[in-house]
Amino acid sequence: MSKVTFRERARYWFDNTMSKGTASLIGWLAVVSVGLIVLVTVLTLWLAPGEPEGVSNVGEVLWIALMHALNPGRIAGDKGSIAYMTVMFAGSLGGLFIVSMLVGLLANGLKEKVDRLRRGRSRVVESGHTVVLGWSDQVFTIVSELVKAQSSQKRSAIAILAERDKLDMEEQIRETVGDLGKTRVVCRTGRPTEPRDLALMNLAGAASVVVLSPEGEDPDAHVIKILLALAKRKGAHPPVVAALASSRNIAAARLAGGEEVHLVDSDDTASRLIVQSSRQSGMSVVCMDLLNFDGGEIYLRTPKKLVGITYGEALHAYQTASAIGLRRPSGVVLNPPMDTVINADDQIIVIAYDDSHVRLAAGKHAVDEGAIVMAESEPLEPERTLLLNWNGRAEQIIRYLDGYVSPGAVLEVAADHPKAGTNLAGLRNLTVNVKDCDTTDRFALESLGVGLFQHVIVLSDDRFDARHSDTRTLMTLLQLRDMQSTLGEHYSIVSEMHDENNRALAEVTEADDIVISDTVIGLLLAQLAENRHLADVFAYLFDSRGSEIYPRPAASYVKTGTKVTFSTVVEAARRRGETAIGYRDSQARNDPPHYGIVLNPDKSEVVVLGERDSVIVLAER
């Protein structure tokens, strides 16, 4: 091996010095400038002594050389011998080069500084803020809902950490969400799985953390890695809410995140909502109203005045709020038996538009006994359901549907997906038939005999990207709508879509329910980030066990076409062992944003319910 020469060492040292950035380069430029000034001074004293006229010492010559180096234009005003003019001209040329280099270095250094700021690498100094880790379409729903939830606060903040450009994130949020009110949205570029990047978010001072499931393959692995990074941190650990795509990864995620993490199973939640919506028209709209911060919200209250009375009596206790259940030491129960006595350690679960609306009524509500109808519940009969298209959650949807229907029910699966109808062993009530079908083709749909079915579920085909899949779903819905109009067929339609912006287009099809799974999960994450104590309530709502939300014919509760107060509707439902929380006006079923659904009306509000209207209740199947 050859010996390193002095020249190589010097060059190596010089290269390392030059690579240290703008400050080092400016330092070298200063050295060159000093050398140039000294050289010009020496040459002037040697070749043109006594010039310019009136200069008597070395210091004055140094000053003149410095001025020529900094301002090359001074050469135009010089007078003297050829030697003096030549030296000054050379010094001015050298100065021109140095000044040009200096301007370039300063501009480049400023650009680098701006780029660093643009990348968003400074530490967040907020406190009591909500931290969002990761990026997906759900981030817009979450930010929008948190802005509404925190609108009453003087100062609130949302900090987002994702592997995206800071300015791009901020611009997308401004364009999609719009007015942010008093809430500051702070974006930082980094990897949520890296402890060093997590340190930028001031997690110790955060109120809650939301972990998003990213797009692409195996998103749960990414979420679990983030949970591990959060658990490894030292210091305070704020509550964490995380979304997982598959139920199979719940155990691993719980082990990684620990007790402070609440996990949302995206596929499971969306599957349950699709099944419930397919059987109870308007279910998705009710859930959206309960999950967002625009309509009715869920509150927990411990009113001492209600201790000792029954749950049935408590249904009439509030004027502008609706009791829906109890939170007991043993757990949450919605629509408990009407004779359940409220204990001192129980909390009443109510729906109200605002915290200030949760107040006890001044007196008893008037009930029109003559308007109450005691109709018997209709027995369950075997149903026929048509499932169009196939995706990864179709199997789960079918298994949940199997738990709802009575024995002898039929499910027809029509899709050209290679996995359609697979892995369905062990069904108890459903008989499943599978047909190969292009669900966008009118003749193929007509050959299915759609009019023979009571319910139609249109899934999003996972072989295509979200945008194209939604386009195909819209085509299918339009075909079904035209078939209903042309052939006079009647069946409920629930459809799954990806993009919330396509809901407005889908309204033309007059589908009974449009389930935007990403929006539902985003709303649920935002609710749990703000109200972690409601996790058990929402879990109960989406569970097939116990009471669920049902829109049932108004004629089964009160006389139709008659003016009645909503308290009369509540009493009619109470006598059936059900909790009434609202009604649906059939004439407004296609009018956004609530599609005819009125939740939590004032108990004294007078309503006239028609034959096609529904009462929305919490009831057992």
Language-model features: locations:
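Cytosolic regulatory regions of ion transport systems
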Residues: 1-621
